[in-house]
Amino acid sequence: MSPEAVSPLRRRMIEDMTIRQFGEKTRRDYIRQVREFTAFLGRSPDRAEPEDLRRYQLHLASLGASYARMNLASTALRFFFHVTLGRPGFGDRMARIAEPERLPVVLSPEEVALLLAHAPGLKYRAALLLAHAPGLKYRAALSLAYGCGLRVSEVANLKVADIDSSRMLIRIEQGKGRRDRFAMLSPDLLDLLRQWWLVKRPRGWLFPGQQPAQPITTRQLNRACHAAADAAKLDKRVSMHTLRHSFATHLLERKTDIRVIQVLLGHRKLDTTAVYTRVALKAIREVTSPLALLAPPPPS
């Protein structure tokens, strides 16, 4: 496909997404999906036929693509054909793959404490005396994910000005779904953040990246989380999002109203929050099995 054929289409698709105020990540993902479909097709995507979309899905399935990957391709290509090319119904032959319902991985409070204690670099206990305290930085970041139930992108994009110590709140700007919200700020977490600020004295981003003008990346945070889990010898698959899952589950096990948890997590629908009722196991463990209540039969 010639650059002359691609460039106008890509530009128009970007404009269509800009008009609809799609997030930067969504725009990148959609462009990449159309680019990969074009490479498979071997010609300009505006010359595609409905059967080509079906063949492409079959191609992805043969490669072992995940449910999320298959559905992202379907959503992006539907947008491209329906909106950018003005062909409503063109992508109807693309199947929507039903994702299996998997329970989130949740750490126990003891495992969370162990994870935080093994944040990379935390062996430097006199962190406040050091010019660089990587352990304090990552412990603060991981503590935010667990203590406030934040997504990894929300931790990465926090600014110093978002910490409202007078009201004990953290402002989350433009979280998922481009909605602002407030997260709770505990005294212990505030103390930890103040320790971090005294060491680094960040002015803009709370956790600056390698380039101070840019925030830390989500990849860096997840790597730090994986390193802490390995050092703590946890046998579960742990990521930054695991800390968010654990936050919600532990609140639910302490009988916090699920609607309050919904607000803290920034969920639009209560159904999304309700998944944690399936992993909040304290109530299940406290139930007495009917087997234990059976009386022995009278002697014959």
Spans of model-derived segments:
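Conserved catalytic core of the tyrosine transesterase superfamily
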Residues: 1-300
